[in-house]
């Protein structure tokens, strides 16, 4: 275990798909991290490697090289059983909540399954289910309903509740507002900020929307074609971007300068 200023960090992380001549490197030596209680925004265009970092952290993708550190402990060297125990400390909420919810399970069963994977007993965990539904501003009666009975914004809240039910230390939100309309998007963003403060969560927020990332993040890391090109406090990166790619991204947001003038 090594000392680190970060709660969660990746060091020289490389991820590649395939082998030999057909291998395709999607992350090249990326180093970034998030401090305890803060939110790191990961931005970049489609294919930049944002989601790959998240999936490598939770073990969906395997690191070809580099380290993934949680409280200074390298997760890449852990065995399956050890990693499973650590995995509950870091939860990922993805863009499509419907895909992450079993359509044959009630919401109560889905949350109970997160708490106890061997027995998804909604009655046994009724208090826990009601607590976390309430935390994301949903009524306890939602526990008896099925995923298709909810709107996209409500399903995203349910996915967040399910992730929080195991009481993680780090929450990774991967494009969770991209499919929502503006008003619902604002509700979810405000909810995340409230949860971060009330639960002392550390967060990684992934999005291609620079305005959204600016709203929720303390620091921002900019990715381009699998490489980290810039990182720093949100205000520094947005007001004085150093890398040409970052400047191009900011220039592509039509309302960015207008919002700055109105502020």
Regions found by a protein language model. Give the residues of each.
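Conserved ABC transporter NBD signature motif
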Residues: 66-74
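Conserved ABC ATPase signature
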Residues: 146-150, 154
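ABC ATPase NBD coupling module
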Residues: 20-22, 62, 75-91, 109, ...
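Conserved ABC ATPase "signature" region
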Residues: 74, 123-141, 250-251
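A short, proline-enriched helix->beta-strand linker immediately N-terminal to the Walker B motif
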Residues: 165-169
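Helix-to-loop junction immediately C-terminal to a conserved catalytic motif
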Residues: 58
